Amino acid sequence: RNVLETRRGSGTYVKDLVPTDLDPLNLRNVEDKVTLAMNLVDLRLILEPGIAELAAYNATDEEIEHLKDLCDTVEYKIEHDLYYIQDDIDFHTYIARCSKNKVVEQIISIIETAVLMFVNLTHRRLRQETIITHRAITKSIAEHDPVGARSAMTMHISYNRAAIKEIYDARNRELENQEQ
């Protein structure tokens, strides 16, 4: 059942067993977490702007009010230096729900679960950007402005990508220096 791991020159070990619902993409075992973070943010950049666009087309007035509440909660927690990561994930997951695409809802929950693995890489760096872009995303969805929603989500994920890219590049420079 793939529970043993043989390490050359070291022996055989029982693998770290994590329920698949906590790691549905089985990414916990990927050793290069920084590259994994880049891969995940690139996937988000491909998917989430289109999801926000669908949400702008399909969100009901009631859903828009709830989305505004989620946006306000994230903003409040950021401004009061409270843990907001789960609320941020709830915000993105709810946008997927507003898209009215059942496949998107499932995919985004899997991606957001994976994002939890590396969220500490960026969340302290992007507090103000998160507030500004979440507001823009919410406003565009509330106004049923699909182009605005797509653009705002692209900006939001791009900020995340830039922060992760800085870490990725710094790590690669460090590895190059170690090889010399």
Outline where the language-model segments fall.
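Short linear motifs at protein or domain termini
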Residues: R1-L45, E53, E174, Q180
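Conserved amphipathic alpha-helical segments that form helical-bundle/coiled-coil interaction surfaces
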Residues: L40-N120, E129-T138, G148-A162
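A glycine-/small-polar-enriched, mobile loop at the entrance of the PLP active site in fold-type I
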Residues: H123
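Short beta-strand-centered segments that line the small-molecule binding cleft or hinge
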Residues: L126
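Residue-level detection of the helix-turn-helix DNA-binding "recognition helix"
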Residues: K165
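Short, charged, intrinsically disordered terminal tails
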Residues: Y168-E176
